[in-house]
Amino acid sequence: MTEKVKITFLGTGGMIPTEKRNHPAFFLSYGNEGILVDCGEGTQIQLRKAKISPTKITKILLTHRHGDHTFGLPGLFRTLAMLGYKKKLVIYGPRGIKKTIDGIFQAFGDTTEYEIEVKEILGKFLETKEFAISAEQMVHGPLCNAYSFLVKGNTKLDKKKLKKFKIKDGKHLSELKQKGYMNYEGKKYVLKNLAIEEDDKKVSFVLDTAFNDRIVPFVKDSDVLVCESGFGEELAEKAKAYMHLTSVEAGKIAKKANVKKLCLVHISERYEKNSSELLKQAKKHFRNTILPNDLDVLNV
């Protein structure tokens, strides 16, 4: 069975943090991978509250260089060094993000005992046997990426079918998986006739962007879409001017892209007391929409 993807919503707020919502940050865990998507101010504290050790981080995906998505990095870098972090920390982001990271170390005169590698990426930039991560350029002030994390569905043998054909356990089953066929007791068996194909799982993150034609194809068929919703429909013109999405646009994107679940994030402080209105607006267009709170966890 494909291993579960777990999303911890460390920060669901917008540019100004509030009592309830921290700057944007999301932790995606899958197997031995701990992927931090954005690192706003206060992310370290949120990790502690979520009982996630910073040393669990294997990769950081930065959507763009704006402070509400990056101000948590200087402290995180120093904490990892203090905790004896031994892994190579790989940071991915749009073109120009290397200059941002270099600037952090220049500003604080800091060094780390562990290796940091910064990669400026677009398109599918990482693929293993189990998963792939891709980036797509969005429309914001500075260059900005959306990200998708795709877990490849497994092919597993169907025990009921094996029993039906009286096929016992043994090395021949390993051969079946490797070659796609096997000879067993004088008969030839094909893998697809004895197996169950699990579906892929896809999680997408769209933060800080104006509506554009690249969003829907990129997030298409996502099991979970974590999408910014900084403005209500009543402020649609302002959202457009500042290059952000409204809750209505998020709902329409989810519906058109055949998404299974929509999570509204990047909630502006102006909606601190009535964020449910954003949820209501999005649900008119896409029913399976939720409004996560900080430290909520979602298993995919």
Where are these predicted regions, by residue range?
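Active-site-proximal loop/helix segment associated with metal-binding centers of metalloenzymes
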Residues: 17-18, 129-205, 209-218, 224-226
